[in-house]
Structures are given as C-alpha cells and as structure tokens.
Amino acid sequence: MTQRDIEQLKELEAKDVLDHKEFARYEYLKKKLVNDARVEQFKKNQKEPYASKRSRAVNLAWEFFKDPQIDGQCYVAVGGLDSITLFLFLRSIGIDIPAVSVSSLEDKSIQKVHKALGVKALKPLKSKVEVIREFGFPVISKEIAGKIDTLNHPTEDNATVRHAIITGETGAQGGYRTGSRMQLPKKWLKLFGGADEEGTALGYQKAPVKVSDMCCYWLKELPCDLYHRETGRWPYMGLMASEGGRRQKALAINGCNYISENTRRSCPFATFLRDDLLRLALEMDAWYHDHWQEFRPIVKEREDGTVEYGDPIHLETIVPTIYGDIYQDEKGILQTRDAQRTGCSMCGFGIHREERPNRFDLLWERNPKEWEFWMHRICQDDNGEWYGWDRALDYIGVKWQKPWLYIEEKRNAEAVEQLSMFDQKSTTMSQLDDAVAV
C-alpha cells in the first residue's frame, strides 16, 4: 500500500458514518492491507535457502493430503518438467496418488515420459485449432488476453469492467480507483483498445485477429475439472509464483495450499525459483533410477474406469528432450539448455519477451510441417486467405521469419562454447601434468 492509501484508510476508520462510495473504498483498502502483508511474507519465503523450501514443500504436501476436507482424495495434474518433478517428489515422500494429463497437447518427448510414469491421459474438450478459430489466439499473457477478449465481447454486464480496462477507472468492486492495474498497458491498449466503442472514440486500433485466454480452459482446465467431478479427487499442481502472470499474485495471496467451498488445490512448489525446481528435478531423476520398476505404463483403459498396466519402461532421464540438458550457467544458476518452459505447441503467451530462437523457431527445428501449419494454415479471413500465427505475430511486432538462421546461430554458439570448455579442461590437465613433472 502507498502512504496515501494508509492515510486514507485511517481517515475512513475515524469516520462514524460512511456513504456507499466511502464504504466500498474502505473495504477495498482493508483487503489490500491484508493481501500486501501476505505478499511480503511470501516474498521472504521465496528468498529462503533451497533446503528450507524443500522441507516446506514436504510439509505442505502432507498437510493437504491429510486435511479432513481432502482425506487423501488427490491427484497430480501433470504437464511439463515442473509437474513431472512434483509427481515423483510426492511419490518419493510416500504420497502415492494418480497422475493425469492432457498429454496430447504436450511435446512428443514429454508424452514419452508421461507414458513411462503411468500418467493417465485425458482428452481435451476441443482441438487446438477449434479453440483458436472459435475464440482467438493466446497471445501476450493470459491476463491481458482475457481483457482483450472482454473488450471484443461487450455487454451491459461488463460495461464497468470494459471502462476500467480502457481508462483504469474502477467501480465499487475496485474501490473507486483511478489509474488502476485493470487498465491495459499503453502498448497493448493502442493495438487492441479499439475493439470497444470507448476505445475506438479514443483512437485505439482494433486487431485483425481475435485474441482470447480461453485455450487453457477448454484444453486443460475443463478436462481436469471433469476428472475431479468423476472421482472426487483434488489436484496437486506444479505452479511456481516465480513464473509470473496471474499465478504470481494468486499464489502469494491465497497460499500454497488453498481450500474453499468450491476450490481445493495444493502447490507445494509455489515459493520455488527456477533454480530450486531444476535442483529438485536432478534429485528426482536420481531417485527415479532407483525406483523405475515401480512405474508402469497404462496400456488399456476399460469402460468401467479400471486400467491395465504394461511392463515398466526405464527412461534414460525424467527430463524430456525438449528441454535439453540441465546445466549451471556462469552465475551458478541451473538452466535448461533448450526450452525453458513448455506447453501447447500453438501457445503464444510470453512470446513477445523471448529472444530468437524463440519457441516457434525451436518448433520449426523439431517439426517443420507443424510449424508451417501453425504459422500459415489455422484460419481463413473473409477473403478466403489462410493465415495463422504469422498475422498475429506481425501485429504485435514479433519476428518469426527464417527460423533456420537463428537455429544455426544457436547451434554454432553452443559448439564454440563446448570447444572452449574442452580447451579449458585440456589447459588445466596440462598444467597439472607440468606440476606433477616438477
């Protein structure tokens, strides 16, 4: 809270009677005071040593599992390396529960790991193409895409929200603020604000493509929600606040374990940084090789819900090849050599922040035909012309052409780095030989 907010809260608390607008502002400031304190404590937890975070994750996982409202009825929502690590981590501490995933959305190397670990495959409610054609491209961030989608679908009920997105001025629910974070950043307001009449009047543009945050709902969230309804199980999730976006504030305010009337979930890794997660992934990789025979792939699912398992498959590593190897950079921080984060091959959230080769460039390297489809063959405009991510990326100023040039540049840089490391090692060995000779 700002000093001005604190002073205003004191002024409102000193009043005997508050009018409607003052009361809304008072309620907002009280809530903000509590939430800000939670966020500060969460940030302190993020700065703790790895051992402390790991120990807390163990306690959080068991606390959720044993809660009377959960009573062991849990599952692990598995996707990329973060949640693969979570699944193995839970198993390593004695929490043996099912893992489920909409695996068809993931990279082939991730699907391979899912299969070997016995992860149950769920089906998306719509295909990736159907979601983009019906709702729009998932671009910039989930939060911003959701606001753009709201502007594109004006109703009387969302008029106040649309006004806040355009101007930053909120109503009663937002505490009658001005300049709030509800407003789209100026860069995106200029490009997308014209979807709303108020934005058009202010001179903002309307995008030539639809934008939406609905992809995750139809492809991942709804299938998992249906699994919960069928089984009564609640999820463990591998989310980390350090990844930013909506989850950062939600995890800080609601906590690692969240239990309410309609929502229950556990995120034991919420305070982890990327380095923490990769360190644990290496530990779980070692643990897996001692216990790999405990994991069997699902080879058949029967109509009654039971499954048939096959023989164990011994993975070379639990780290899917899309990530490359895990290495320590010059600052001593663990990194993955290739993909940093993964998801649907057509997802564009955060693409504007990536240097080339970006995720679409790397997709071209893995599968040129899939790249060609997502770039040029998803939708048709009113003139019958086909387009895809090419049009969306052009509009937001993200370069995508000639991915092979950037892939080659990256591989050359890696070769030079490996040669340099070899030379350094050879020099060190030579110096040791000289020392021994003396």
What are the residue ranges of the model-derived segments?
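Intrinsic disorder/low-complexity segments
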Residues: K15, R25, V436-V438
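Short, solvent-exposed coil/turn linker segments
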Residues: E13, S127-E130, P403, T428
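Secretory pathway export signals and precursors
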Residues: Q8, R25, V211, Q340-G343
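ATP-dependent adenylation/nucleotidyltransferase module used to activate substrates
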Residues: V17-K21, R25-D276, A281-E283
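ATP/NTP-dependent adenylation/nucleotidyl-transfer catalytic domains that generate, transfer
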Residues: A37-Q41, K66, G72, N262, ...
